[in-house]
Amino acid sequence: MKRYIIALISLVLVSFDSGKTFAQQELLNTAAAAYDSAQYQRTIDAYEQIATQFGVNPELFYNLGNAYYKQKNYPKAILNYERCLLYDPSNVDAKENVELARLQCVDKIEAIEPMFFVTWSNGIRDSFACDTWGMLAIVFFLLFIVGCGTYFFTHRTARRKLGFYSALLSIVLCLICIHYAGAQRDHILQRDYAIVMTPSVIVRSSPAESGTQLFTIHEGLKVRVRSTLSGWSEIELTDGQVGWMPSEGLEVI
């Protein structure tokens, strides 16, 4: 009897999963057809429904970015391209498209370049997604085991040397991959960057309307959120300027 119950439960679960897959594919087909026929709002609605029901992924954010770009909703396009790059920093098309969208925005702020080694390290980190770094770490760890096996279980000097240096190189590369997998994960979880969604907003010296007006920024600008307080966000621009603006005018990447 127990076997029949288990089989029945398995059948129900498989049927449920197949139903989800079919429903998701139907929505993807709807979104693609709507995009091809220039019905961009319908495309957006379909992708948003997929995100709500089935979760998000880089391709979904990229397609949403394209639909918003076609609508000339550049802040939303930038937001979704940035979200795509957060999960898949190696997506070249998203990198190009987000720069095209930024050209349509008002603010053109010169960024302060970080130290060269920070840029270099971040570039390495963004070469792969977190999962890819993790897979590479596993591969190098397996090569480390093979190298150790070669060193300990062979008697020829040349092979022992090859095994030793292979194991040494593999464990170093494994640790590097683990480091960048962690760095990429922290980068995703930190979520301290946001896109300005308000057409124009005055940035103030304190979290209150009575604060001194420092400067004005516009929709589509990417900022770093340093802290929040009572409906206000302390933001930092890429040129180092800092101030407070209403949190409702921001959408976190």
Predicted regions and their residues:
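Internal/C-terminal transmembrane anchor helices
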Residues: R160-Q184
